[in-house]
């Protein structure tokens, strides 16, 4: 298969026309034969264990099961590449083509796409300007809809008729002296398709724009909603009739595999059962139409075909959910695509990438704002190519194999080289869900023991992280451009403001707030001890470290600075030599005879002194 390198700006998901669906599955073989249509519900032959021709696993349509080998075994080996076997009609190719080659089913009757019928808002209902209930009545063969009222005064365009009402009109229509002409009614997806075909989008959009200027209230809202849908159809150049399926795509067989288990039984994807139901009903409808079966039987078969296609696209969206073995609902195409475990979020957006790791985060209060603690074991694995390069560059080993052996032995020199390698090499930390750009930031790694990533507590609000078991992913920017970009744009200190509000996002939270509160909190159970006097803050901290006092013990400590205190004096004592002692609730002042301050003691706790020292050190102030 030739590889094509093509750059693109975006991926657009759009409605597919029947011709495009056919084009996906239809292929012209080198011998001129056109293949692609799946006509049989069979999967594999249970005696030969080979796929049935024209079935859901057909090798002629989807490609060979074994590399470079046709179905009958006439051609084997890569030298026959591109040859189509005359006996079985299978093209000799790689088996991996079965992962991308599609097929299609030509439906005997049109069916509505359940997403456009049953999703809210219902696009078919909005476009036709018919209530959803009424559209469903028509689609599932409960009511008729007037597609042409003709000259009948009692009928109007898009009017719903019951079975009895239509029979009464039909009787009048086929009478010899009947004056009724041009009356047409329809039922099922065919009728909806005809109504959609009758809509001229450009004309309808123009008339709605004029209507919006005149009408008010609910009618205006309804018209705006309808105009928006019509404008989208015009903008994407989509035909409304494409919401009615006449050709059904069949996804590649290797995306809905069938595997043999040890006991000889087979495990298969639910999609195969759902496709088989569609094919059985489609083939039965074709046979009934060929033998000119009564209308009521054909109509019932068309309804069953509609329900089987609904179940294939979105099982359970409408009507009874199709169950498999053990009374378990079968997984439809929608179930495979949507949700956290779906194809987009699990496999496409959530891919595992090289040079990345994941671990629990713990608080690292000793880190700088631009640093994070990276476990040594993880760092060695992530930076291994850089370490190997450095070991060879320094002449410590001769080749990659020897370097890997050295790393496996955990030699001391390896850790020294790792320290050198991570210097100035930023790493990216990401916490899911990444709801804004600050969910992924760059840090300079610091090697730490253990297996947890250490995170600076100030960056927690940006990541919306806490330390109750949260995990974060680590990514290594490899190229110099990526490293420069991470350092210049993504480093944590440069992401100070929230991009949403412009307010500071680097602020104390979680453990920091709790720690500050705990340090400064008062303990009512602790008694003010008049005998605990200290000459300075250092003595208090020494007493705390030697466990003579507790973190919340009240102490009197000498302090000669200014104290802003509005407390009233509770007692005044006269001392020898006309000296005075002024006692306040939280301080004691000793004054000389001229009222000059001699000494002052303040009431505090070791916790408050600790916080005070940290604040003053960070502000680079001294007493």
Curated annotation (Swiss-Prot):
SUPFAM superfamilies: beta and beta-prime subunits of DNA dependent RNA-polymerase. Zn(2+) binds at residues 70, 72, 85, 88. It comes from the Eukaryota. GO terms for cellular component: chloroplast; DNA-directed RNA polymerase complex; mitochondrion. Gene3D superfamilies: 1.10.40.90, 2.40.40.20, RNA polymerase II, clamp domain, RNA polymerase Rpb1, domain 3. Belongs to the RNA polymerase beta' chain family. RpoC1 subfamily. DNA-dependent RNA polymerase catalyzes the transcription of DNA into RNA using the four ribonucleoside triphosphates as substrates. This is DNA-directed RNA polymerase subunit beta'. It comes from Guillardia theta (Cryptophyte). The lineage of its organism: Eukaryota, Cryptophyceae, Pyrenomonadales, Geminigeraceae, Guillardia. The gene is rpoC1.
């Amino acid at each position: 298969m030739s590889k094509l390198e093509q750059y693109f700006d975006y991926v657009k998901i759009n409605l597919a026309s029947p011709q495009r669906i056919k084009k996906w599955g239809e292929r012209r073989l080198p011998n001129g034969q056109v293949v692609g249509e799946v006509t049989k519900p069979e999967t594999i032959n249970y005696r030969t264990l080979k796929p049935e021709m024209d079935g859901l696993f057909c090798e002629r349509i989807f490609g060979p099961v074994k590399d470079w080998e046709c179905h009958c075994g006439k051609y084997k080996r890569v030298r026959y590449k591109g040859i189509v076997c005359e006996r079985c009609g299978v093209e000799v190719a790689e088996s991996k083509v079965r992962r991308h080659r599609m097929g299609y089913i030509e439906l005997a009757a049109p069916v509505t796409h359940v997403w456009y019928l049953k999703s809210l808002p219902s696009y078919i209902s909005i476009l036709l300007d018919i209530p959803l209930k009424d559209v469903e009545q028509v689609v599932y063969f409960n009511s008729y809809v007037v597609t042409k009222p003709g000259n009948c005064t009692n009928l109007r365009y898009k009017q719903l008729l019951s079975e009895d009402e239509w029979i009464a009109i039909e009787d009048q229509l086929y009478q010899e002296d009947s004056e009724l002409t041009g009356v047409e009614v329809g039922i099922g997806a065919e009728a909806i398709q005809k109504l959609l075909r009758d809509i001229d989008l450009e004309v309808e959009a123009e008339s709605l724009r004029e209507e919006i200027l005149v009408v008010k209230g609910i009618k205006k809202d309804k018209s705006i909603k309808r105009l928006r849908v019509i404008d989208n159809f015009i903008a994407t150049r989509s035909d409304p009739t494409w919401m009615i399926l006449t050709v059904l795509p069949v996804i590649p067989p290797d995306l809905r595999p069938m595997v043999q288990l040890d006991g000889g039984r087979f495990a298969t994807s639910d999609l195969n059962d759902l496709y088989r139901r569609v094919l059985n009903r489609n083939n039965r409808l074709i046979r009934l139409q060929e033998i000119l079966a009564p209308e009521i039987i054909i109509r019932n078969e068309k309804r069953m075909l509609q329900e089987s296609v609904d179940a294939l696209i979105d099982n359970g969206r409408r009507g009874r959910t199709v169950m498999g073995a053990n009374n378990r609902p079968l997984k439809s195409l929608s179930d495979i695509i949507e949700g956290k475990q779906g194809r987009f979020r699990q496999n496409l957006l959530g891919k595992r990438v090289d040079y990345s790791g994941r671990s629990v985060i713990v608080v690292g209060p000793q880190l700088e704002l631009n640093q994070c603690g990276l476990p040594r074991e993880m760092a060695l694995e992530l930076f291994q190519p850089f370490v190997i390069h450095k070991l060879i560059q320094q002449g410590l080993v001769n080749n990659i194999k020897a370097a890997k052996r050295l790393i496996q032995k955990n030699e001391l020199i390896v850790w020294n080289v790792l320290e050198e390698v991570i210097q100035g090499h930023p790493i990216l930390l990401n916490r899911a869900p990444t709801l804004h750009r600050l969910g992924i930031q760059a840090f300079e790694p610091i090697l730490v023991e253990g297996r947890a990533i250490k995170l600076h507590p100030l960056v927690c609000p940006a990541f919306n992280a806490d330390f109750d078991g949260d995990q974060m992913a680590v990514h290594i920017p490899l190229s110099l451009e990526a490293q420069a970009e991470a350092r210049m744009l993504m480093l944590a200190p440069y992401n100070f403001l929230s991009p949403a509000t412009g307010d500071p996002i680097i602020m104390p939270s979680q453990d920091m707030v709790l720690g500050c509160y705990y340090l400064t909190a008062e303990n009512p159970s602790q008694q003010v001890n008049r005998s605990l006097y200290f000459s300075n803050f250092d003595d208090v901290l020494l007493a705390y470290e030697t466990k003579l006092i507790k973190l919340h013990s009240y102490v009197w400590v000498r302090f000669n600075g200014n104290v802003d205190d509005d407390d009233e004096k509770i007692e005044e004592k006269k001392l020898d030599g006309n000296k005075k002692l002024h006692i306040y609730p939280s301080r004691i002042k000793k004054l000389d005879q001229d009222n000059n301050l001699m000494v002052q003691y303040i009431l505090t706790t070791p916790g408050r002194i600790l916080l005070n020292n940290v604040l003053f050190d960070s502000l680079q102030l001294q007493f």
